Amino acid sequence: MKKFIELLSEPILATLEQKEKEIWDVEGRLKNANQPFKFDIRPLKQVNNKAEKIGYFKSKSDKMVFETINQWIIFDTEELNEYVKSTDKRDFNIDELLNNLSWNLILDKVE
């Protein structure tokens, strides 16, 4: 996720306490954007042969970042939480979220 931080202007890393209690990792402004955000950039983890990322309703992050092979996919944390609360499901795939959430941003990785 260090590569994602390179996409931010003047990034500020969260303290250990902020990571644990507020559940965000870095604050910064995407280059060519005008508003700073707190990003949850925790990586996906392999669990039962699935890549997953656990979200938390108490998160103080503004945006949640998912890394794929070729892209960074960013969702609005509040909208994501509201969507999760509105369903009976606990597992969601990226395509479903892209189709059902209005705020998302896809950034292609540049090597």
Stretches with model-predicted labels:
Residues 1-20, 30-33:
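Acidic-basic catalytic patches of nuclease active cores, encompassing PD-(D/E)XK
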Residues 33-79:
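Catalytic cores of nucleic-acid endonucleases
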Residues 27-29, 42, 110:
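Intrinsically disordered, low-complexity regions of eukaryotic proteins
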Residues 25-27, 65:
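Residue-level detector of beta-strand face positions
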Residues 17-22, 56-58:
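A short catalytic or substrate-binding loop motif that flags glycine-/basic-rich loops and adjacent residues
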Residues 22, 29, 38-40:
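Polybasic/polar functional segments that serve as interface/processing modules
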Residues 89-111:
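Charged phosphate-binding loop/patch that engages nucleotide di/tri-phosphates or the phosphate backbone
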Residues 78-89:
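C-terminal/domain-terminus segments
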